[in-house]
């Protein structure tokens, strides 16, 4: 079609116009054909209502009918089969198609039989084949040995660490030692863990234990030996190491972690491939639940200092994509108004996907919503557990058995077992900030001579983890368990105890040491077979605590202790036999207490019935209990897919409000003894891990590909915007191809293929990273606004100088919540800027103090640190990192600089997005004077009408992302009604305090046209933005 055709043009024919006249007079002047009109949906929607056009349409379609009928059948076959042959021979053009295009021709119902008949002039329909991809699931061994070679006496060379599967070679791996930027980019790529399935566990041996050679404790032994020999032998020997060989010669292992700042114990830091992503997926939600925040604080709270390290581990989008099993299509939305106001996971009460920034005032509601969804999801998962139909052997007559024994077995029923396992599993899956307790109002507890009460109390202490119970519950359970064994003494015995007249107790030596040896052997075995977990330093680690052993928390531990890890990321069905040892331990422990209970009755001269009765119950059908335990575990595994689940924490976390309990999971008092005696049943379906994951029930995976592209691009943008990130926005703009390669590499970790072609993934990533994303300001709703200042903008007749010598103040610590610019009434022509008060001298750290500071740990000077090289351009992030290492309560780093301002005039009232700008920090080795430059800072202004005349004002809705505040210094004029105040360095400016109840005040305009800018611009860089 011609480009000169008017927009919305509809070629309507005349009433008596012929087909030839219509084509020559109406269509040809716009370079249109009749087929073009038929294939245009907008035109046909209007012309189908025109009778004159419909007559011409019928005439056009019947015009060539005889020629089509006379054509031979061979020609017809050639016409139909020709596109198929071309499609098989040359499928490549399909990838280059820009989008899915389906051309549809609107026809009458009478002409429906004509659809399959090809016409000579009709263009071929172009249908772009969408890229179909699927999630990449690799296979990985659960355990790999540590290989090393000992030469030169005790000198050790490590050939394999056993953690190579955790690291993938990124596009920057080869040059990571030559370019510091590539080292940081390689580390960033390795934070995205590849999903993997560990190899299946072997079958247990005849004793019910899985062979120890297949678990991490053997790896720990290698690491311990390696660490000990390495620390003793290699201390003063320096050898050359080939960077590409993978061999490591080291004199003392301090950490095997892949991430800096993590101070981990060596033999506790080994994790199976892909495991970490599942654990860290919950951390973002946990931050909303556990930590208290300081609104608008001058120095960030400890959790905010660690935010940059925590964010790197949080990839809930990918974790959810790997674990999702729902046929519902995922809707990909992209709101241009909140492009950059995104975190990896910003929570609200409705969903876990990307949403606008949550304000601090909403943190409590966010926490409640997240916890409620966690409790609800966990309860729904465990609801499939049902009561057992197992029949118990009960006392048949009351002639031999006492009435209270018969009553005890009458009260021992199956339903409490199912209720107990439902609530216990719900607590373990989603019990964050919830309390686990036992119902102490059961009617059985009201009877003082109940036989079942002490047995049920003992069963609760045997089955449950007492560290999860409150002290009051534990005291009550112990009291009820021991109540039959005291309180029956004589008055004389009580008096003797009160007068300290207690007989001396003589401890006899243990006659048989085999029992002691057995206990020691069991203790050692339990220690060696614990699941590996990382014990990290809270001051330097990315997360305060990562206890893999109890996250997710599991109520039952199978033989070997490593089976839970394979269950969560494994590829075979759960082995019930692995729980036989623990099931047997539960039975033996309960029988020991029952025998002790019967022994007391025998000493009192009473008949004993409990031991024989419980022995018959627990020994009949011995497989029922470990099958029931397996059902509980299988149900929990089935439900662990949901990202809503937040497991309980193991121990106190700094900053956590552990006293704030929002939910209670109350177990029935007889639930534990009922579970040991009856077991449970499962109404849920059989569960085969990864079966549905291999075939995602979606009509097309192309939306998933688009969604992943946006998420990966957002990850890179967030890392660049983070002051503690590994690269900056300037790095991205200068090295665009490298960052697009990085995004593609990360996507290929999760997807088997990406969209190629001219308009494929690479094209879209370039748009997301460098074309379509802009910084948008958010609304100022931060507490503490009364402490801010309002800088008056009196700019009538001001001409901005191009180069200005001034100072830059770089804020060291970010505030908890950003302070942004606000204009609630866009129709007004007056604008104001909020700025913080300039800090005192003792809060300012000079740049020269940073570069000349020598660290107490013996580190080298600034000029010799491994991150800095002569002539390198430093960004703001590096200055902040160096400033944080210097003791003292400093808030800003002062840098003498020269600023270049770029005035930008706004011609209309629409919002304009600020372009990025850079602040280059440069130095020369050996020169004390540091020189820095801030270039091309956009300063937006517009000419507005005020009292009938034009006036130059700043537009503050479009300031850059770093919230650079430009204070324009004016000459003092008492007639304006404002007294000048000193901001810093003798600079005088117009400042007035903003009331906490009012966001904006009416600005007062300078009516003197001769008012000019006297001195320079004071540049305050305050990185409140994203």
UniProtKB/Swiss-Prot annotation:
Region listing for Disordered, in residue ranges: 60-96
* Keyword Transmembrane (UniProt): no
**Organism's domain of life?**
Viruses
Q: Does the keyword Glycoprotein apply?
A: no
Q: What is its main location?
A: virion
User: Keyword set for this entry?
Assistant: Capsid protein, Inner capsid protein, T=2 icosahedral capsid protein, Virion
According to its UniProt entry, what is the function of this protein?
Self-assembles to form an icosahedral capsid with a pseudo T=2 symmetry, about 60 nm in diameter, and consisting of 120 VP3 subunits. The capsid encapsulates the genomic RNA.
Question: Would you tell me the protein name for this molecule?
Answer: Major inner capsid protein VP3
Instruction: Print the organism lineage.
Output: Viruses, Riboviria, Orthornavirae, Duplornaviricota, Resentoviricetes
Its gene name is S3
